[in-house]
C-alpha cells in the first residue's frame, strides 16, 4: 500500500478516484480500475476504502483495516493504489472528500470513477449536484443497471454534459460536470453476491471454517 499524504502535495498527475466499501474486494474492482487507467489515460487510480458507507448497512461490514489490507494485497501499489486517505481526512461523504482532495492536491487532475449502479443511485447521495461540480466523472457498465442508470434522475439532469466515449482520453482535462459512459465488457460480479455466497457456504457447513477475502 502506498501512503498518500492527507495534507496533500504538488503532484501534477491524472488520478482516478474509485471509492467504496470494498466488502469484499473482487475481480470487478480490478477490471474497472484497469479499464479506467487505459481508457482515461490516467497516471494512477486510487482505491479509496470508505470507513463507513452511508448507503450501506453496518451489519456484515468487515473491519476497516481488514478491508484496507485486502485491497492492498490485490493491487500493485504503483498505478493502482489502495489508500486510507478518506479515513485520515476525517470525511464521511463523497462531496466533502472530493472537496478536500481538490484543495490539498491543487495541481492534480481528478476523475471520479463509478459503475452504472453508482450512477443509478447518484441522486440519493448527499449534495450530489455539488459532487459532480467538483470533478469530471466516468461510468463503467454493470449488467442490469445500465438502462435504468442512463434513464435515472442524475443522468437525465446531466445529459448536456455527457461526452461521447471517444472523448474519454481527455475527460481528466475537462471541467466539471463533464462525464462519460465508457465502453467496456460488463462487470457482473458484485460484493453483495460474494457475501451472500460465503453465507450460503457457511450455512451448509456450519462446523467448517471458511476463509473469505475481506475488503
UniProtKB/Swiss-Prot annotation:
InterPro entries cross-referenced by the UniProt entry: Cyt_trans-like, NadD/NMNAT, Rossmann-like_a/b/a_fold
The keyword Transferase belongs to this UniProt entry's keyword annotation: yes
GO BP annotations, alphabetical order: NAD biosynthetic process
Gene Ontology terms for molecular function: ATP binding; nicotinate-nucleotide adenylyltransferase activity
Tagged with keyword Nucleotide-binding: yes
Catalytic function, reaction form: nicotinate beta-D-ribonucleotide + ATP + H(+) = deamido-NAD(+) + diphosphate
E.C. number(s) listed in UniProt: 2.7.7.18
Superkingdom, taxonomy of origin: Bacteria
Alphabetized UniProt keyword annotations: ATP-binding, NAD, Nucleotide-binding, Nucleotidyltransferase, Pyridine nucleotide biosynthesis, Transferase
Class in the EC hierarchy, top level: transferase
Family (UniProt): Belongs to the NadD family.
Annotated function: Catalyzes the reversible adenylation of nicotinate mononucleotide (NaMN) to nicotinic acid adenine dinucleotide (NaAD).
Protein name: Probable nicotinate-nucleotide adenylyltransferase
Organism for this UniProt entry: Gluconacetobacter diazotrophicus (strain ATCC 49037 / DSM 5601 / CCUG 37298 / CIP 103539 / LMG 7603 / PAl5)
Amino acid at each position: 500500500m502506498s501512503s498518500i499524504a492527507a495534507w496533500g502535495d504538488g503532484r501534477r498527475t491524472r488520478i482516478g478516484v474509485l471509492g467504496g466499501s470494498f466488502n469484499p474486494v473482487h475481480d470487478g474492482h480490478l477490471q474497472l480500475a484497469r479499464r479506467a487507467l487505459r481508457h482515461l489515460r490516467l497516471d494512477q487510480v486510487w482505491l479509496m476504502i470508505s470507513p463507513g458507507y452511508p448507503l450501506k448497512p453496518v451489519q456484515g461490514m468487515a473491519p476497516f483495516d481488514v478491508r484496507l489490507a485486502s485491497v492492498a494485497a490485490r493491487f500493485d501499489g504503483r498505478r493502482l493504489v489502495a489508500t486510507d486517505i478518506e479515513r485520515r481526512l476525517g470525511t464521511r461523504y463523497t462531496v466533502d472528500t472530493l472537496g478536500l482532495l481538490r484543495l490539498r492536491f491543487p495541481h492534480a487532475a481528478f476523475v471520479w470513477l463509478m459503475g452504472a449502479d453508482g450512477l443509478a443511485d447518484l441522486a440519493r447521495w448527499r449534495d450530489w449536484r455539488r459532487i459532480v461540480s467538483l470533478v469530471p466523472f466516468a461510468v463503467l457498465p454493470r449488467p442490469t443497471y445500465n438502462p435504468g442508470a442512463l434513464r435515472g434522475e442524475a443522468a437525465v439532469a446531466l445529459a448536456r454534459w455527457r461526452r461521447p466515449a471517444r472523448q474519454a482520453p481527455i475527460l481528466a482535462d475537462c471541467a466539471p460536470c463533464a462525464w462519460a459512459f465508457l465502453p467496456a465488457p460488463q462487470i457482473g460480479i458484485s460484493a453483495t453476491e460474494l457475501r451472500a455466497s460465503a453465507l450460503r457456504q457457511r450455512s451448509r457447513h456450519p462446523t467448517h471454517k471458511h476463509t473469505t477475502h475481506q475488503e
